[in-house]
UniProtKB/Swiss-Prot annotation:
Molecular functions per Gene Ontology: transcription coregulator activity
Family: Belongs to the Mediator complex subunit 31 family.
Organism of this sequence: Encephalitozoon cuniculi (strain GB-M1)
GO cellular component terms listed in the entry, alphabetical order: mediator complex
Lineage: Eukaryota, Fungi, Fungi incertae sedis, Microsporidia, Unikaryonidae
One Pfam assignment: Med31
A biological-process GO annotation: regulation of DNA-templated transcription
Keywords carried by this UniProt record: Activator, Nucleus, Transcription, Transcription regulation
Subunit organization: Component of the Mediator complex.
Cleavable signal peptide: none
Protein name per its UniProtKB record: Mediator of RNA polymerase II transcription subunit 31
Length: 103
């Protein structure tokens, strides 16, 4: 793996915004692994301002919050979760150039 631990974790936490990647993680059984679930909890440090300022896609923190919730298995078994996430991402990317779009 190339890059520092910081760079790898920055890239990974932002990949959580990608519904296709989340589908793949689900199909591969990663969310059934306690080690993986612990890693997701560890990534909560990205919420602190000293780290979150580096995020290009800060909405990944909302996804991370969902992934660390008790009912995540129910959410991941529902295709509507992935569809809604994809629609939200599209809307964010579509409107990001507009001043004050997220206020």
């Amino acid at each position: 793996m190339s890059g520092s631990r910081f760079e790898r974790e920055l890239e990974f936490v932002q990949l959580l915004c990608n519904p296709d990647y989340l589908r793949w993680l689900t199909r591969e059984g990663h969310f059934e692994s306690e080690e993986f679930r612990s890693y997701l909890r560890y990534l909560e440090y990205w919420r602190s301002p000293e780290y979150s300022r580096f995020l290009t896609y800060p909405q990944c923190l909302a996804v991370l919050e969902h992934l660390n919730s008790e009912n995540i298995n129910d959410m991941l078994s529902d295709e509507n979760f992935f569809l809604a996430l994809g629609e939200q991402q599209y809307f964010i990317w579509l409107n990001k150039h507009k001043e004050g779009w997220n206020k």
